[in-house]
Amino acid sequence: DYIKQFEYVLPKVTKAEDHATFYWPSSPSSGGCLDNPDDHDRGDCHYWDVWHGMKPFSDYRSHYFRFCSEFGFQSFPERKTIDTFALPQDCNIFSPVMESHQKNGTANGKILYYISENFRYPKDFDSLVYVSQVLQGIAIKAGVDHWRANRGRCMGALYWQLNDNWPVASWASIDYFGRWKALHYMAARFFAPKAGYIYTEGTKAVISAANETLENQSLTVTVRIRDVELNVLFEETVETTVKAQSSIHMLERDFADVIGSKKRRVFAEAVYTWQDGTTSTEAESFVPYKHMDLLQPQIETSVTEKD
């Protein structure tokens, strides 16, 4: 009996072995007895409308859970990992080999769908693999940013999952061989004790910050609207104090008057400078990335030989 095991037997055993550690009966749970276990106002919730439900990343902002203990998004492992199970002729995400290393049904197609919603089609297989990892990081960041910015209402977010037990396309941020995906690098930033967040909706931008340290932190944020040539079209500096273990919405503004008809050629930028000198920059476009009129990069490199 599930309830007997998890709500009577295991709590007693746990308490006998460890008097200090808090016991939670299940996940998701609203406290026990399978009483509306995914209640947004009690306990912890699992959320999969983004990914399984094919909802856009913006849907995270419609949900204010008390604690989101499971949500996720898939990507492919890096090419070195793929090469351990696939020959060059198998390097198509719909090949039998690639689909056999995917245990979530038609998920390779789902990754491609989300890429099409956010980016232009990658030029080759390696680019597609890379973009899938960037997309995974953006997806998880969207949820974490929203829930951290609403600290107090939501007190935690755990993404699914950390790692893999075989080389595969999955929700993991570290692959089977211990190689970090883009998500794991990004998580180090968006889960930082002091972090800034920005999101856009239409021509509106919302700027927030979170402070998980035990001390109040003074913060200066410079908000800019730039065009793709990096010209500054708008600039405003906001100074505030973010209390210990709290979050704050610092600025919400409609930039229609600044953007005008240049929506595809501008973006919002927020530069955060904390009292200890720590800085970070967040940026977001006002249209899907695939619709941005970005400049072609001019990259120059030089090699210098040294003894």
Where is each model-derived feature located?
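Active-site groove signature of glycoside hydrolases
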Residues: 1
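Short alpha-helix
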Residues: 7-10
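Substrate-binding clefts and catalytic carboxylate motifs of secreted carbohydrate-active enzymes
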Residues: 12-15, 25-27, 31-37, 42-217
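Hydrophobic beta-strand positions in extracellular immunoglobulin-like domains
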Residues: 209-211, 225, 272
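Intrinsically disordered, low-complexity Pro/Gly/Ser/Thr-rich segments with frequent PxxP/GP/PP motifs
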Residues: 221-264
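Short, exposed coil/turn segments at beta-strand boundaries within extracellular/luminal domains
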Residues: 231-232, 276-281
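Short, aromatic- and glycine-rich surface loops/edge beta-strands on solvent-exposed regions
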Residues: 261-277
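Edge strands and adjacent loops of beta-rich recognition modules
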Residues: 280-307
